Amino acid sequence: MPKILVLYYSTYGHIETMAEAIAEGARSAGAEVDVKRVPETVPLDIAEKNHFKLDQKAPVATVAELEDYDAIIVGTGTRFGRMSSQMAAFLDGAGGLWARGALNGKVGAAFASTATQHGGQETTLFSIITNLLHFGMTIVGLPYAYQGQMGVDEVKGGAPYGATTIADGDGSRQPSATDLDGARFQGRHVAEITAKLVG
């Protein structure tokens, strides 16, 4: 059974919710799944003042443990059309793994959230995917086999590059049922592809 890490950074809980849905999907395909978050880099007083969600139950990941997994699914909210600085700092810290080729051949995937429909979902996914490709990972997206990302009948996330959600400028919109279904689909899809690759 493949061993999968869902690695995320979430300021207000939207990506935390998506991470749990991705993990649920991966487990439904028989994978062993851990959900972990990257360290917060914002000082506590500022995080509290800005109402960051500080009660997240997922343990904090370490760079060293990344090589223990067959697949890593990375998620973060967008910052100016790219991944958050917290996630970028964590991945930047994996230079030693890159130098040893420790992640070569592992499966990688991305998911994201933005405040608006045009707030950089796909560029944020690409910023994650670019890092994973530099690590030598094989990328798995959210294929159009997931029909929920089609149509314009409602505000919805999702792209062939990964599951997404839209939080609204004030963070009031939580991931919809469609967004969460997409996350579960991607988690299951990553688990199935990983199982084929690792035997």
Curated annotation (Swiss-Prot):
The keyword Iron does not apply. NAD(+) binds at residue 12. One of its GO terms (molecular function) is NADPH dehydrogenase (quinone) activity. Binds 1 FMN per monomer. Its EC number is 1.6.5.2. It comes from Rhizorhabdus wittichii (strain DSM 6014 / CCUG 31198 / JCM 15750 / NBRC 105917 / EY 4224 / RW1). This is NAD(P)H dehydrogenase (quinone). GO terms for cellular component: membrane. Its cofactor is FMN. Belongs to the WrbA family.
